[in-house]
């Protein structure tokens, strides 16, 4: 019997409380698949350790990067920046059989399948502007006023691209080609939301410029999409757009998930539940 397709994101294992959650991330069925939609942590070795651990437990693990994996922090002995850092993370994933946006899409054969599981890496280009801004410069000014400038501005380097938005546009173009070749229904997996609508729930709307790109807004309509999984916002919930379920599956920081009360955060069932 096929297992379930589960999803989680924003584990942020740099926090001891979050790292302690790793032991509880185990399948209930040996055939369960797990999506990890970015922000495992910031330190290169931590990301590899977590993904290797999960790959040893689940039948299949699918990962796509968040912004935190792409940071280059002074304490990290791996000083790779930008695309080189991402490519090195992909190599680590392949060593443990974890699927990435650079691999052939895995096909889930559960009761709702076959369904392609498509991890996407599109980044952002500052086009999710808050009210009162129409340009990147205006959006950044509003974020500075609100005190919510994303740490990406300091730690996420776009090398060899001239800017994060240039890297984003290259990723969007490459991803669009891959999606156009899909011949199965797919679950789209992105760290950043594919639509602007989910960012309307942000406590600080000035943070939206770091949350995606308007270039991905039509992907869920242009393809046979069985569901969309994302993280980044630290607002776990399910919403519906154009008849398709969008699951935000983040754990978030300890102060966030502890405030929600109840049991420790668990992966969301996407298919097969």
Residue ranges and their predicted role:
Residues 1-6, 105-119, 240-245:
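Beta-strand-turn-beta hairpins that frame and shape the catalytic cleft
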Residues 1-63, 69-74, 273:
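N-terminal active-site segment of His-dependent metallophosphoesterases
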Residues 2, 96, 200-202, 206-209, ...:
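Binuclear metal-dependent phosphoesterase catalytic core
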Residues 7-9, 34-39, 62-67, 100-104, ...:
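Active-site neighborhood of phospho(di)ester-bond hydrolases with catalytic His/Asp-centered motifs
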Residues 17-21, 40-56, 68-96, 109-112, ...:
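Metal-dependent catalytic neighborhoods of phosphoester/phosphodiester hydrolases
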Residues 49-55, 100-101, 106-114, 135-136, ...:
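Short amphipathic alpha-helices and their capping/turn segments at secondary-structure boundaries
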Residues 83-147:
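Hydrophobic alpha-helical segments and helix pairs
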Residues 118-187, 194-203:
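Active-site-proximal loop/helix segment associated with metal-binding centers of metalloenzymes
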């Amino acid at each position: 019997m096929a297992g379930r397709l589960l999803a989680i994101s924003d584990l942020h294992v740099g926090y001891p409380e979050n790292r302690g959650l790793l032991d509880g991330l185990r399948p209930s069925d040996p055939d369960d698949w797990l999506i990890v939609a970015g922000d495992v942590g910031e330190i290169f070795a931590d990301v590899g350790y977590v993904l290797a651990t999960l790959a040893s437990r689940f039948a299949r693990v699918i990962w796509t990067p968040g912004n935190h994996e792409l940071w280059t922090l002074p304490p990290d002995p791996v000083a790779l920046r930008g695309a080189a850092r991402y490519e090195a993370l992909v190599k680590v994933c392949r060593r443990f059989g974890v699927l990435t946006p650079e691999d052939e899409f895995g096909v889930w054969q559960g009761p709702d399948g076959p369904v392609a599981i498509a991890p996407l890496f599109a980044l952002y280009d500052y086009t999710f502007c808050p009210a009162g801004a129409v340009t990147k410069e205006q959006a950044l000014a509003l974020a500075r006023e609100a005190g919510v400038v994303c740490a990406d501005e300091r730690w996420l380097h776009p090398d060899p691209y001239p800017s994060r938005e240039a890297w984003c546009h290259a990723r969007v173009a490459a991803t669009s080609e891959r999606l156009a070749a899909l011949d199965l229904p797919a679950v789209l997996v992105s760290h950043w939301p594919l639509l602007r609508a989910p960012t309307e729930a942000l406590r600080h709307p000035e943070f939206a410029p770091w949350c995606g790109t308007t270039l991905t807004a039509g992907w869920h309509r242009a393809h046979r999409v069985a569901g969309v999984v994302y993280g980044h916002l630290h607002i776990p919930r399910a919403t519906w757009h154009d008849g398709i379920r969008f699951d935000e599956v983040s754990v978030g920081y300890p102060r966030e998930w502890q405030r929600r009360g109840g049991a420790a955060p668990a992966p969301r069932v996407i298919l097969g539940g």
